[in-house]
Amino acid sequence: MAGYRVEDDYDYLFKVVLIGDSGVGKSNLLSRFTKNEFNLESKSTIGVEFATRTLKVDGKVVKAQIWDTAGQERYRAITSAYYRGAVGALLVYDVTRRATFENVDRWLKELKNHTDPNIVVMLVGNKSDLRHLLAVPTEDGKSYAEQESLCFMETSALEATNVEDAFAEVLTQIYRITSKKQVEAGEDGNASVPKGEKIEVKNDVSALKKLGCCSN
């Protein structure tokens, strides 16, 4: 997967959402991936923010539009608009706060209620640098991810550990499902998506499982 590109020239535009409790590090994951920055004093997001980054996947240029919102209940009203058009999600918990992991199930249900059932989801245990404060063993995250057929990674936005890999894996899975469906539909493999359009990943329950997903 290639690095940063300045040009606003792409073949695919994928919307990816960050979900999970407030304070788990969603905004820092976003800024680390899109700007390679980390802010120790970042405050809770108010409303919705999004940032973009363009990468190459299998020779195609993919633009990721990544949305971040606060986890507090008072922002629930924006739910529908936030999820609309999303084809990927990072479901984030804090490995040092057990309650954030216990709330993952509620977040996943909400995600499924507002998106296509075949959305690509990565379960992310963030703040892996704080090993001395660990409250959620890696095996707990892996087990839940396997149970729900999700990808899984532990990350550290502070140390930039696995952040690139987590986003890249989600975008790669979305792209491969999308391109597979294009081939099956008899479309030209070089067909590009007009700017401003989202690729919808629909009706392909088995595709992600066939392709395989990360579990490290």
From Swiss-Prot:
Keyword list, A-Z: Cell membrane, GTP-binding, Lipoprotein, Membrane, Nucleotide-binding, Prenylation, Protein transport, Transport
Membrane topology term: Lipid-anchor
Keyword Membrane: yes
Residues binding GTP, per UniProt: 20-27, 68-72, 126-129, 156-157
Lipidation (S-geranylgeranyl cysteine): C213, C214
Cell compartments where the protein resides: Cell membrane
InterPro entries: P-loop_NTPase, Rab_GTPases_membrane_traffic, Small_GTP-bd, Small_GTPase
Molecular function terms from GO: GTP binding; GTPase activity
GO biological process, one term: intracellular protein transport
Entry-linked Pfam families: Ras
The keyword Cell membrane appears for this protein: yes
GO cellular component: nucleus; plant-type vacuole; plasma membrane; vacuole
CDD domains xref list: Rab11_like (cd01868)
Sequence motif: Effector region, positions: 42-50
SUPFAM superfamilies associated with the record: P-loop containing nucleoside triphosphate hydrolases (SSF52540)
Chief location of this protein within or outside the cell: membrane
Family, per entry: Belongs to the small GTPase superfamily. Rab family.
NCBIfam families, per the entry: small_GTP (TIGR00231)
Function: Intracellular vesicle trafficking and protein transport.
Protein name (record): Ras-related protein RABA1b
Organism lineage: Eukaryota, Viridiplantae, Streptophyta, Embryophyta, Tracheophyta
Gene name as annotated: RABA1B
